Amino acid sequence: VFHSPALFNFIKENKDNYKAIIPITIDYSHVYYTTLYAPEKTIVIPTMHYHKTAFRSTLTQVFTKAAYIAFNTTAEQKLARKIFGMHMAPHSIVSVGIELSAPSDWAVTQEKYNLPDEYMLYVGRVDQGKLNNVYTYFLNYKKVYPNSDLKFVLVGKQYSDPFNHPDIIYTNFVEEQEKISIIQHAKIVINPSLYESLSLILLEAMALKKAMLVNGNCNVLKEHCHKSNNAALYYTNEKSFIDKLHMLDSSTNLRLEMGEKGYSYVNSNYDSNIICLLYT
């Protein structure tokens, strides 16, 4: 857990040297102490979702005394309004800008990690809390559609035991340029998380014109589906997962159409130049 008394003292003693101080995420104590010592200069980026962290009593001061609250999505803003009510500090949806690194050489990357030609991709922390039922759903999909060549590739540090199956491939940690190349060559990108405040991987994948499949039980991910005109499809149970995955797996035209929609969605809403103007 991040906790730095030295940082908090620095903010207290040097706040007059800054026009604004921007603590990111409510998960750690820095957001509380920044608001305590420099409320008039604090712009909070909460990155909150429906989790016990959001209901800490100390956050009442953060969300009512800060100069401004910059949310990532409408769903996040609605959650905060339900918790903190009419006394919440001035706020709006600001979000973040998306900038992508240049990709690594695909032939080298594919050989290094023994990646297949057709795969559904997950990028993030590899643990059961983030993946939910996606292993079971995917393997049942392969049973229903045994002729599918689709594999499941997971990129990220492993925090739980691997699920051993020939159709499931783990890369563990990869470099940023390698990650971009792996996203570029994915057939489908998935985010099965139930808790998100934005989902950078969704925006990165859309910026690279990839079709997305997401957990519709997460309000933030579902919001992206609607706002992007279905550049991402969502599932809510095993049946809808299998149905939506088959749609994507079997239709090149659908994936291309969704890719163009996603690219447009990110350029219109998550361009870094546009986001920076909102903070001025």
Regions found by a protein language model. Give the residues of each.
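Donor nucleotide-sugar binding/catalytic pocket of nucleotide-sugar-dependent glycosyltransferases
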Residues: 41-52, 59-105, 115, 122
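Nucleotide-activated donor-binding/catalytic signature segment of Leloir-type glycosyltransferases, i.e.
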Residues: 156-181, 188
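Conserved donor-binding/catalytic core segment of Leloir-type glycosyltransferases
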Residues: 70, 113-131, 135-139
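A short, well-ordered alpha-helix in the C-terminal region of glycosyltransferases
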Residues: 247, 254-268
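Conserved small/polar residues in nucleotide/adenosyl-binding loops
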Residues: 279-280
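Short hydrophobic beta-strand element within catalytic cores of glycosyltransferases
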Residues: 211-215
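Aromatic "clamp/platform" in nucleotide-sugar-dependent glycosyltransferases that forms part
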Residues: 194
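Conserved acidic donor-binding segment of nucleotide-sugar-dependent glycosyltransferases
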Residues: 227-239, 247-252
